[in-house]
Amino acid sequence: MNIVPGKNAVSNIPFDHARVDRLMEEAGIDVLLATSKHNTQYLLGGYKFIFFAARDAIGHSRYLPIVVYEKGGPDHAAYIGNRMEGGEHQNNPFWTPNLHTACWGTLDAANLAVEHLGKIGKQAARIGIEPGFLPSDAYALIRHALPDAKLIDATDMLERMRAIKTDAELEKLRIASELITDSMLATIRWAREGSTKAEIIEQLRREETNRGAHFEYCLLTLGSSHNRAASPQAWKKGEVMSIDSGGNYHGYIGDLCRMGVLGEPDAELEDLLAEVEAVQQA
């Protein structure tokens, strides 16, 4: 599904645009082209397109969402997305006044960004880009189409933008952390003597998924081995298990580590745990 590119009234900008304007001014940036999933999600108030949640590739190219934001000009903001995102807008309208859900790959997305910059008179502006998240073919198109523009690495500016969390973001981080902790404790209770690392990791994945988190990874050790990769190694009585896992909750990562022992801990382990407790309570 696609909708005709159009312009809507600015309403409910989902971030502190005055602060973003200040950060852009300090970085010498006139207009942003945000292309990473985490920064486009932030600038769109938490939105991400579920179709490309797990994989960006499509055909011979890839998904490239672009948020265009002009310093001091939110009425010139635009979102450039995939053709299928027109339906997303119909159900939950994007805040950006300009919307172009007309892309399948990187080049058509970059071309629409160039066209929009021309319409708002920013062909020769200082344009902030994300070099690590801008495919080379899209970069080359932008560079060729805008020879008078100055392309600036906006990575640090965007990191500073997201550094101060809102109350809503902190709540998501809290929920993400609690979901991961609860999943780990449930997995440790589930595991038995003979449970392999691969089986334990798969159980943790199920626990996190059932609680509403998107499983990212699990690094697991058993006994004296420091190898954290999945394997047929089985948990033995008296061995310590260390689970380090990250799970995604609406774009925010809960990343924690918990430990358990199969059976009763020995005296040495009790002493070590007491030392850890003493440090934590100090």
Predicted regions and their residues:
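Active-site neighborhoods and metal-handling regions in enzymes and metal-associated proteins
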Residues: 1-282
